[in-house]
Amino acid sequence: MSQKILFIDRDGTLIEEPKSDFQIDTLEKLRFEKDAIPTLLKLKNFGFKFIMVSNQDGLGTPSFPKENFEIAHEKMLDILKSCGIEFQDIFICPHFENENCACRKPKTAMLEEYIKHELYDKEQSFVIGDRESDMILASNLGVRGLRYGELSWKEIENEILSSFRSASYQRTTKETDIKVKVCLNGGKVSIKTGIDFFDHMLEQIAVHGGIGLEISCKGDLEIDEHHSVEDVALALGACIKKALGDKIGIARYGFALPMDECLASCAMDFCNRPHLVYKAKFKKSHLGALSTEMIEHFFYSLSYAMGVSLHLKVKGKNDHHKAEGLFKAFAKALKMAVKIESENLASSKGVI
């Protein structure tokens, strides 16, 4: 099973690297980089595993005795363990660069088992290091590299936590071909379904939900809009669910009451027990090319694809405003529910 893994360099990234001899061979030289420990603790709580990958030039030679290295190295590991941080594996290359060995970073021989058996999730794993060789290693592993020094540990934390809340999803049937991209932390908005009013409503989800949203839909509109609206809902719901991953840390619940001359409300729970309560009446049969009866069907399909319990209701005079109010209320509730506000799962059962 592939895991979310951080491949972490040691000297100059996790702990300070002495500029005098580039060796940490005494306890006096052992100092942690700022915010390294609290960042790793937080990332651990979001399900990341840690692997140390380090080049130690000449380790075991008279210029760098192994026993001297191990004194500081073991102390470092003891400190990390006392804080709740342990490495799943530790890989150290002891060779000089001119020895042209197979294991020295950025080569990947030390990580061959992880590559061969696909033990890491390429989309959700990272290399963290302070040298160009670390960035080349990231490329060789097919993951993203984050360069410490250019980024602080807190900035690295933000980069990682934001990037894994994105997803892409494609749904292709005989009636439709739909592509969806979602970034729950914001981003580009581009929506083209062939139904202008529906595009306008979907834009409300992106803008008022604070999410990046790209949707393209090619559907059988020559028949009617039913398949396009339904399948967009299914694809969007599946994509949001995929972007949330294990849901650790999310608020889980959302509630919103935007008001104009109409009153629209939405209550949402990411409980994985899909259900829709929908209370809305429209005087018109269509808004633009969108049938008003398809609005309920959209939210029904969306709630089941997302795995949420969803309560929507609206009252007012203007049908356009009522429809827009429903989508805005949903967007605001979604923004609240997916916000990361802790490091735990919002469930006494331990699962959502």
From Swiss-Prot:
Signal peptide: none
Region spans: Histidinol-phosphatase: 1-164
UniProt keywords, alphabetically: Amino-acid biosynthesis, Cytoplasm, Histidine biosynthesis, Hydrolase, Lyase, Magnesium, Metal-binding, Multifunctional enzyme, Zinc
Subcellular location: Cytoplasm
A GO biological process held by the record: L-histidine biosynthetic process
Positions with a binding annotation for Zn(2+): C93, H95, C101, C103
Record's protein name: Histidine biosynthesis bifunctional protein HisB
Species of origin: Campylobacter jejuni subsp. jejuni serotype O:6 (strain 81116 / NCTC 11828)
Gene: hisB
